[in-house]
Amino acid sequence: MVGANIYNTHNIHDPNNLNNLNNINNPNNITNNMHNPHNIFQNNYFDPKQLKILVDNMTPQDLELLLTLSCKKGIIRDVEYILCRIMREMINININYGLCQAIENYHLKIVELLIDHGADINYNNGLPLNLAVKNGYYDIIELLIEKKVNTNDNIFQLLTHCCQNNLPNSLRILLKENISIDPIYSTMVNLCLDNGYAECASILINHNNSDSTINSESMIHDTNLTTSQTLLELDDLLELDDLLDGNDYFNYNQDESDVGDDAENDIENDIEDDN
């Protein structure tokens, strides 16, 4: 995991640092107790006074650690205060670890906050987007795309992941980039159909039909490709008709209020089916 080493308390190694357990003389002293690194890991929430003392006296290395842990736990107040000190004193730390932890643990507001404070959405070869797609967090995917995340390097891998794991909302948002899926179209559609993922298959077919219409002038010069696509789409539509069993996924429009993650929606659908 990226940045996993920062969770190791042994990284707090400076013997002159207040974090060193040997420097804690008075157990009743709030400052010393708070600088015990074990307290940082065990406490889920600091009161405002504790937080101020802790953050204002931390070294950059420990500040980075606390920021990352706060992002992981989703404690937005702590994240805001830490970022305030970082910006005020122009402290140079890596806030991208925190961004990845916030995405992995689905803390949308913290993701927005970190991006607004300069976190790199293309960090580590697109890890933020990869994490969002892996977990099916389509509102985070949408946020990253709105912020102009780079989707050029691994878009086909991301789309394939959506098809393999039946993530229709994530797939739909990624395809809003108006990309051509010709190189992997047949593979992805067949993958969806083989697994019974009708909605994902219909999204791909609709996108490809729309893309073919937009680029019809260029496709005239590629007769073989157009013919093979047409034959594939006819077969796909017949198979989809059996899968859908009368359900109209082709005219599906996502409700603007429908936010969350694909995995959560799948669970809700299963519950409804059981009832």
Swiss-Prot record:
Keyword check for Repeat: yes
PROSITE patterns given in the database record: ANK_REP_REGION (PS50297), ANK_REPEAT (PS50088)
Keyword Repeat: yes
One Pfam family, short name: Ank_2
Region Disordered: start-end pairs: 253-275
InterPro entries attached to this UniProt entry: Ankyrin_rpt, Ankyrin_rpt-contain_sf, Multifunctional_ANK_Repeat
Keywords assigned by UniProt, alphabetized: ANK repeat, Repeat
ANK repeat windows: 94-123, 124-153, 155-183, 184-213
Comp. bias (Acidic residues): 255-275
PANTHER family in the cross-refs: ANKYRIN REPEAT-CONTAINING (PTHR24123), PROTEIN HOS4 (PTHR24123:SF33)
Annotated protein name in UniProt: Putative ankyrin repeat protein L715
Organism: Acanthamoeba polyphaga mimivirus (APMV)
